[in-house]
């Protein structure tokens, strides 16, 4: 799919539902990896996370900085002892973005979720993150809407 077609598709998604400001998919599902799929979220290097997160965005009025909050319910990283969580790594064809601001949620002593925060300190960081999310959303059948 061309970049302009992807931008048009996202423009439609943005204008369709203006009640929330989230990339999200309500149910956990299997992610089908297609040829050409280049986006991934990882907590352990080399282990793609298949649980699709809810993502909430905030941005300053002048656009100089912003924050993305990722909420993963029952992520794969807790299954089969895949390794220690060393951060959250957002990888696509442009490279990798990462954060170490990652917290596990526990209920009755068992891990049930992960919350991560990715801070964007410049407008260029924001634009780069949005390009990643557009690709990730396309690969995982997500939509975007503003609140």
Swiss-Prot record:
One of its GO terms (cellular component) is chloroplast thylakoid membrane. Keywords: Chloroplast, Membrane, Photosynthesis, Photosystem II, Plastid, Thylakoid, Transit peptide. This is Photosystem II reaction center psb28 protein, chloroplastic. InterPro entries: Psb28_c1_sf, PSII_Psb28_class-1. It comes from the Eukaryota. It is a peripheral membrane protein. It is found in: Plastid, Chloroplast thylakoid membrane. Residues 1-34 form a transit peptide. Belongs to the Psb28 family. Its main location: plastid. GO terms for biological process: photosynthesis.
């Amino acid at each position: 799919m061309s970049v302009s077609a992807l931008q048009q598709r996202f423009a439609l998604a943005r204008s369709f539902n203006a009640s929330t400001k989230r990339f999200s998919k309500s149910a956990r599902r299997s992610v089908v990896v297609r040829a050409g799929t280049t986006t991934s979220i990882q907590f352990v290097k080399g282990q793609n996370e298949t649980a699709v997160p809810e993502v909430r965005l905030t941005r300053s009025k002048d656009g100089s900085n912003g924050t993305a909050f990722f909420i993963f319910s029952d992520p794969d990283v807790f299954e089969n002892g895949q390794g220690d969580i060393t951060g959250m790594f957002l990888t696509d064809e442009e490279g990798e973005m990462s954060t170490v601001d990652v917290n596990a949620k526990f209920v009755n002593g068992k891990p049930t979720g992960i919350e991560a925060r990715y801070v964007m300190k410049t407008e260029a960081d924001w634009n780069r993150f949005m390009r990643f999310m557009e690709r990730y959303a396309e690969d995982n059948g997500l939509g975007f809407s503003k609140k």
